[in-house]
């Protein structure tokens, strides 16, 4: 199983939020130290989120993101505040491997199609963040009327092959992922690569996701709190 330890950036620091609430910040750490720690542990993939960018709707933490890129050879995917082709160009030029478009997929689906045409489907993913069955945008501060299934279908028709799916109610709660939602989406779209995000707190959660047909997952609070040791996660990844 492919694992993406997460580093969420707020004011240049690595933090964890609970259910995406900017007022519930915990675990403030040095993101460069965390990235090095993950690299030293052998992880080949990192998931970065610019929380300031998601809220401001434009890139904010570019300096620290660039420094993380410079210090690790890991595959890095990045989301948060990426709303223009120019912003995508900047991040891809500094060596970010894949960009995650979230709010833009809802507000400007043509932009997603343009990005894929320009950069390739392997460099662009779509983040689908759900709250009570509906897609949330703008750093999870706004909830649209679009369902996860509808957005996934629409984006797949525009050439998207990789999706990061988060159930906001599970995020940061350490109570297990919404395996049923993920399984339903994967079954409906078997050709899509779905990366699970939110709620993973035990190795058993990862086994459940594998059983549901999910072959990649983002690990946030679980690795940062030590709920799952990095050595055990690396063993799970193989």
From Swiss-Prot:
Question: Where does the record place the catalytic residues?
Answer: 8 (proton acceptor), 129 (proton donor)
- Please give the SUPFAM superfamilies that the UniProt record associates with this protein: Ribulose-phoshate binding barrel
Q: Which InterPro entries match?
A: Aldolase_TIM, His_biosynth, HisA_bact_arch, Isoase_HisA-like, Isoase_HisA-like_bact, RibuloseP-bd_barrel
Q: What's a Gene Ontology MF term here?
A: 1-(5-phosphoribosyl)-5-[(5-phosphoribosylamino)methylideneamino]imidazole-4-carboxamide isomerase activity
Q: Top-level EC class, please?
A: isomerase
EC number(s) per entry: 5.3.1.16
Q: Where is this chain's protein located in or outside the cell?
A: Cytoplasm
> What domain of life is recorded for the organism?
Bacteria
Q: Its pathway?
A: Amino-acid biosynthesis; L-histidine biosynthesis; L-histidine from 5-phospho-alpha-D-ribose 1-diphosphate: step 4/9
Q: Name one GO biological process term.
A: L-tryptophan biosynthetic process
Q: Name one Pfam family in it.
A: His_biosynth
CDD domains listed in its UniProt record: HisA
Which Gene Ontology cellular-component terms appear in the entry? Answer: cytoplasm
Similarity comment: family membership? Belongs to the HisA/HisF family.
What protein name does the entry list? 1-(5-phosphoribosyl)-5-[(5-phosphoribosylamino)methylideneamino] imidazole-4-carboxamide isomerase
Organism in which the protein naturally occurs: Lacticaseibacillus paracasei (strain ATCC 334 / BCRC 17002 / CCUG 31169 / CIP 107868 / KCTC 3260 / NRRL B-441)
């Amino acid at each position: 199983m492919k694992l993406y330890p997460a580093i969420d950036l707020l004011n240049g620091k690595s933090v964890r939020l609970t259910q995406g609430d900017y007022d519930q910040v915990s675990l403030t750490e040095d993101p460069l130290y965390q990235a090095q720690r993950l690299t030293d542990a052998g992880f080949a993939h990192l998931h970065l989120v610019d929380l300031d960018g998601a809220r401001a709707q434009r890139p904010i933490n570019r300096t620290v993101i660039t420094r993380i890129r410079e210090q690790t050879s890991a595959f890095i995917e990045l989301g948060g505040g990426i709303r223009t082709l120019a912003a995508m160009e900047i991040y891809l030029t500094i060596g970010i491997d894949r960009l995650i478009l979230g709010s833009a997929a809802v507000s400007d689906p043509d932009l997603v199609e343009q990005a894929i045409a320009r950069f390739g489907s392997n460099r662009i993913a779509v983040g689908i963040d759900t709250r009570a069955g509906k897609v949330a945008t703008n750093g999870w501060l706004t909830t649209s009327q679009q369902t996860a299934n509808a957005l996934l279908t629409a984006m797949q028709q525009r050439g998207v092959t990789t999706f990061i799916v988060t159930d906001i109610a599970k995020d940061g709660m350490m109570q297990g992922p919404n395996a049923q939602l993920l399984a339903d989406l994967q079954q409906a779209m078997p050709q899509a690569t779905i990366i699970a995000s939110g709620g993973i707190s035990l190795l058993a959660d990862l086994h459940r996701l594998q059983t549901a047909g999910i072959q990649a997952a983002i690990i946030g609070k679980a690795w940062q709190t030590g709920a799952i040791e990095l050595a055990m996660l690396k063993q799970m990844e193989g």
